A protein has these predicted regions:
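Terminal low-complexity tails and localization/encapsulation signals of metabolic enzymes
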Residues: 1-30, 63, 67, 99, ...
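Rossmann-like NAD(P) dinucleotide-binding subdomain of oxidoreductase/dehydrogenase enzymes
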Residues: 117-188
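Alpha-helix N-cap/helix-start motif
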Residues: 12, 39, 76, 94, ...
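Glycine-rich loop-to-alpha-helix module at the N-terminal edge of alpha/beta enzyme cores
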Residues: 26-116, 126
Length: 188
């Protein structure tokens, strides 16, 4: 299924595709195949809650990311198994990616609270300029097939920390890891 607006749902067309284990050719899952209508629905959902999400405090966003970091570690074997099945990466390498990917969540959980901006002198030296950090709005995040968790965390974590909503489009070859990560973020 597709995660749109915090809810799992089938693709609007009802179409599906198979995810295959590259080592055996066996189908390991059948997933909903999103089309342009689903993409628009996902963007509309992200836009609809952007202002509300941007008003969450940096501490709230940091706590979500920290909890996600903890959950990824708790679910490390499940993540590694999914990656190995859907992309053929050796299990030990998949475990390494889980550890690596989780670190983005931890790092951005700490950075989220450093959202205070800064004062800088203007060139004339008589005034000071204030630089504030603000969410830029919904982000489109596209991930490659070869690092399905690490690249998802690398893109999702800064968006969450900054107060941006997002649409994540995983690679069609490795969507299971992204789905499991999306559920993990919901659980956080």
């Amino acid at each position: 299924q597709l995660l749109i607006g915090g809810q799992w749902r089938d693709a609007s067309s009802g179409e599906t595709f198979d995810v295959e284990n590259p080592a055996t050719g066996a189908t390991i899952a059948t997933l909903s195949s999103a089309n342009s209508d689903d993409a628009v629905a996902a963007l509309d959902a992200a836009c609809a809650v952007q202002d509300e999400w941007a008003r969450t405090t940096p501490r709230e966003r940091a706590d979500i990311l920290r909890r996600a970091f903890e959950l990824v570690h708790e679910r490390a074997d499940e993540f590694a198994t999914l990656m190995t099945l859907e992309m053929g990466k050796p299990f030990a390498e998949s475990q390494g990616e889980v550890t690596y990917g989780a670190e983005y969540l931890r790092w951005f959980s700490e950075e989220a609270t450093r959202d205070y901006g800064r004062y800088s002198p203007v060139p004339e030296g008589t005034l000071r300029m204030v630089t504030r950090r603000k969410p830029v709005g919904p982000c489109l995040l596209i991930t490659p097939w070869n690092f399905p968790l690490a690249m998802a965390t690398r893109k999702v974590a800064p968006a969450v920390a900054a107060g941006c909503t997002m649409v994540l489009k995983p690679a069609k070859l490795t969507p299971l890891t992204a789905q499991y990560f999306a559920q993990t973020m919901l659980d956080a």
